[in-house]
């Protein structure tokens, strides 16, 4: 699973996401993309599940790029623990995804297969998504 090798601060405040994506909202590498239609945090496990679903569908035909990276720590205290005694340990890592972010890209396969693979990946994610072709964004 994806996670940062080294971070300046181990724990971080949660914060909120708002607005549309200003960066990472265009297809850069592949021919097809999966664009977020909602704003949310996506966990490293969800990214990995989506990647596996796509790569299994396209077999050895094409190439997949993951355009998001989980670099936000999510902390959690153990179950049945009294309040206080400091912030809990890092439970998992999240990737912030805003509306319009290109999350995955694909190339080297026909459009129908790419759409099916992206649809499978979309079902693993907690946001509504849209399949886009590079010619659509120009």
Curated annotation (Swiss-Prot):
Give the transmembrane region(s): none
Q: Which InterPro entries match?
A: Ribosomal_uL16, Ribosomal_uL16_bact-type, Ribosomal_uL16_CS, Ribosomal_uL16_dom, Ribosomal_uL16_sf
Q: Which domain of life is it from?
A: Bacteria
- Start-end of Basic residues biased regions: 1-15
Query: Mind telling me which PROSITE patterns this protein's record contains?
Result: RIBOSOMAL_L16_1 (PS00586), RIBOSOMAL_L16_2 (PS00701)
Bridged cysteine pairs (disulfide):
none
Q: Name one GO cellular component term.
A: cytosolic large ribosomal subunit
Any single Pfam family the record assigns to this protein: Ribosomal_L16
Q: Where is this region: Disordered?
A: 1-21
Supply the alphabetized keyword list. Answer: Ribonucleoprotein, Ribosomal protein, RNA-binding, rRNA-binding, tRNA-binding
Give me any GO biological process, just one.
Answer: translation
What molecular functions are annotated in GO for this chain?
Answer: rRNA binding; structural constituent of ribosome; tRNA binding
Subunit structure, per the record? Part of the 50S ribosomal subunit.
Q: Which HAMAP family match?
A: Ribosomal_uL16
Family as reported in the entry's similarity comment: Belongs to the universal ribosomal protein uL16 family.
What this protein is reported to do is described as:
Binds 23S rRNA and is also seen to make contacts with the A and possibly P site tRNAs.
This protein's name? Large ribosomal subunit protein uL16
């Amino acid at each position: 699973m994806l996670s940062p090798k080294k971070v300046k601060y181990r724990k971080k405040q949660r914060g909120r996401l708002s607005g549309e994506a200003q960066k990472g909202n265009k297809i850069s590498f592949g021919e097809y993309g999966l664009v977020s239609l909602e704003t949310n945090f996506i966990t490293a496990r969800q990214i990995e599940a989506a990647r596996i679903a796509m790569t299994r569908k396209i077999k050895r035909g094409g190439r997949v790029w993951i355009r998001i990276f989980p670099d936000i720590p999510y902390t959690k205290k153990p179950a049945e623990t009294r309040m206080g005694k400091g912030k809990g340990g890092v439970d998992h890592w999240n990737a912030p995804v805003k509306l319009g972010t290109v999350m995955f890209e694909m190339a080297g396969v026909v459009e129908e297969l790419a759409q099916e693979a992206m649809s499978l990946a979309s079902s693993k994610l907690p946001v509504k998504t849209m399949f886009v072709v590079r010619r659509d964004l120009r």
